[in-house]
From Swiss-Prot:
<keyword id="KW-0131">Cell cycle</keyword>
<feature type="compositionally biased region" description="Low complexity">
    <location>
        <begin position="100"/>
        <end position="111"/>
    </location>
</feature>
<dbReference type="InterPro" id="IPR039361">
    <property type="entry name" value="Cyclin"/>
</dbReference>
<dbReference type="GO" id="GO:0051301">
    <property type="term" value="P:cell division"/>
</dbReference>
<dbReference type="GO" id="GO:0005737">
    <property type="term" value="C:cytoplasm"/>
</dbReference>
<dbReference type="GO" id="GO:0005634">
    <property type="term" value="C:nucleus"/>
</dbReference>
<dbReference type="InterPro" id="IPR006671">
    <property type="entry name" value="Cyclin_N"/>
</dbReference>
<dbReference type="Pfam" id="PF00134">
    <property type="entry name" value="Cyclin_N"/>
</dbReference>
<dbReference type="GO" id="GO:0016538">
    <property type="term" value="F:cyclin-dependent protein serine/threonine kinase regulator activity"/>
</dbReference>
<keyword id="KW-0132">Cell division</keyword>
<comment type="subunit">
    <text>Interacts with FZR2/CCS52A1, FZR1/CCS52A2 and FZR3/CCS52B.</text>
</comment>
<dbReference type="InterPro" id="IPR046965">
    <property type="entry name" value="Cyclin_A/B-like"/>
</dbReference>
<comment type="similarity">
    <text>Belongs to the cyclin family. Cyclin AB subfamily.</text>
</comment>
<protein>
    <recommendedName>
        <fullName>Cyclin-A1-1</fullName>
    </recommendedName>
</protein>
<feature type="region of interest" description="Disordered">
    <location>
        <begin position="1"/>
        <end position="52"/>
    </location>
</feature>
<feature type="compositionally biased region" description="Low complexity">
    <location>
        <begin position="10"/>
        <end position="19"/>
    </location>
</feature>
<dbReference type="GO" id="GO:0044772">
    <property type="term" value="P:mitotic cell cycle phase transition"/>
</dbReference>
Length: 460
């Protein structure tokens, strides 16, 4: 297995570090949709646990290049435009995905008054419209909307959890007091009125959307935990190069584990499952999700477009289209806010450290035994301890909002501490390299103490 890991890292490194090729924009010449010159042959990043490159099948495919985004991980261009449209590109530069104007027919003739714009054709004659240059009217409407903005009053929840009447009198945080992190009701995006209800719903839902903790031993025959780690490590690099939001990565791993919990898969299809799950998660979370051709591209065209789409369909149907799943990142966002306190400036280093620890947990199959909320709370505990080993990392505010006592975190914190301590010698360096950058405050280079005092786990 060590040879597999070494081969995988050297292969991936050569494909993504020294010879990372960016896709080029289509040319406006007569050969605008012709394939660009063949690039140097690269082995698929996960070729040692996947099937061989399907170069022979690709020679017969009519796929051509596209320039949607540029990403270092890509090794070959993606498909965007059908070659049959090449003759039309000389006369029209209209994007192929843009809907036709309602004022024009298929043959290009005008079907209504040419002086009337296509946008005007959608206007209802029964509604009075405000022109863009009527500034006073727009300002008046905005002022009226703001004056009528109403945020529902706070209400108590069951068992006085997050009771506003109790927290409203607590202004400062010490070992016996709780900071009200939901006091900023002036920002509607914080959903402060419903924050506690949302958290309770997430805690109830996480048990229903969790994968089996023993599926490797019980279900899988050709795939093991090491291969899973290699796949997740590669997907972390993919998400970083494509600049995907963290939620996409966490959902991707959740979909992979849930699918593997009930479906036997061969190692040749493991990378296919990974890119299909990432494509689903990207569609769910991203504003501009990568196209299916791009996911074929990042595998060095190991899989055809139809294969990725078929796997996507299999995953969606097996998961019954239940794509909303509470992940560690969902809980971590709120727990970081609780760790900061309402009156403290956001501590970027603490947030980066907690995110680093949480992403390390994605690589480890055994961490599935811990719930996402427990991993998030433990990541906050360990992050605070690493940044300041002299202070007790847990307090009443964190206990209140996470609903975990310090003693309940002990097992998970120990597992995360082990991951942090061995990260520098790990053969899966994607997370460490990611968080060794300046934009993440170099948190991966922080020293992780090997021992945490027992009294820090005593409930205060």
């Amino acid at each position: 297995m060590s040879n597999i890991l070494q081969n995988r890292r050297s292969s991936f490194s050569s494909s993504t570090k020294s010879s990372l090729a960016k896709r080029q924009a289509p040319s406006s010449s007569e050969n605008s949709v012709k394939l660009m010159p063949a690039m140097t042959k690269k082995r698929a990043p996960l070729s040692n646990i996947t099937n061989q490159k399907i170069a022979s099948r690709l020679q017969n495919s009519d796929s051509v290049h596209c320039s949607n985004k540029s990403a270092k991980l890509k090794i070959a261009p993606s498909v965007c435009v059908n070659a049959s449209f090449s003759s039309n590109l000389q006369q029209s530069i209209v994007p192929h995905k843009v809907a036709s104007s309602p004022s024009k027919s298929d043959d290009g003739s005008v079907s209504m008054d040419e002086t009337r714009s296509s946008s005007d054709s959608y206007k209802s004659p029964q509604v009075e419209y405000i022109e863009n240059d009527d500034v006073s009217a727009v300002v008046s409407i905005e002022r009226k909307a703001l004056s009528n903005l109403f945020i529902t009053p706070n209400s108590e929840t069951i068992d006085n959890y997050c009771s506003r009447d109790v927290l409203s009198d607590m202004k400062k945080m010490d070992k016996n007091q709780i900071v009200n992190i939901d006091s900023n009701n002036g920002d509607p995006q914080l959903c402060a009125t419903f924050a506690c209800d949302i958290y309770k719903h997430l805690r109830a839902s996480e048990a229903k959307k969790r994968p089996d903790v023993d599926y490797m031993e019980r279900v899988q025959k050709d795939v093991n935990s090491s291969m899973r780690g290699i796949l997740v490590d590669w997907l972390i690099e993919v998400s970083e190069e494509y600049r995907l939001v963290p939620e996409t990565l966490y959902l991707t791993v959740n979909y992979i584990d849930r699918y593997l919990s009930g479906n036997v898969i061969s190692r040749q299809k493991l990378q296919l499952l990974g890119v299909a799950c990432m494509m689903i998660a990207a569609k769910y979370e991203e504003i501009c999700a990568p196209q299916v051709e791009e996911f074929c591209y990042i595998t060095d065209n190991t899989y055809l477009k139809d294969e990725v789409l078929d796997m996507e369909s299999d995953v969606l149907n097996y998961l019954k289209f239940e794509m909303t799943a509470p992940t560690t990142k969902c809980f971590l966002r709120r727990f970081v806010r609780a760790a900061h306190g309402v009156h403290e400036a956001p501590l970027m280093q603490l947030e980066c450290m907690a995110n680093y620890i949480a992403e390390l947990s994605l690589l480890e199959y055994t961490m599935l035994s811990h719930s996402p909320s427990l991993v998030a709370a433990s990541a906050i505990f360990l992050a605070k301890y690493i940044l300041d080993p002299t202070r007790r990392p847990w307090n009443s505010t964190l206990q209140h909002y996470t609903q975990y006592k310090a003693m309940e975190l002990r097992g998970c914190v120990k597992d995360l501490q082990r991951l942090c301590s061995t990260a520098h010698g790990s053969t899966l360096p994607a997370v460490r390299e990611k968080y060794s950058q300046h934009k993440y405050k170099f948190v991966a280079k922080k020293f992780c103490p090997s021992v945490i005092p027992q009294e820090f786990f005593n409930n205060s």
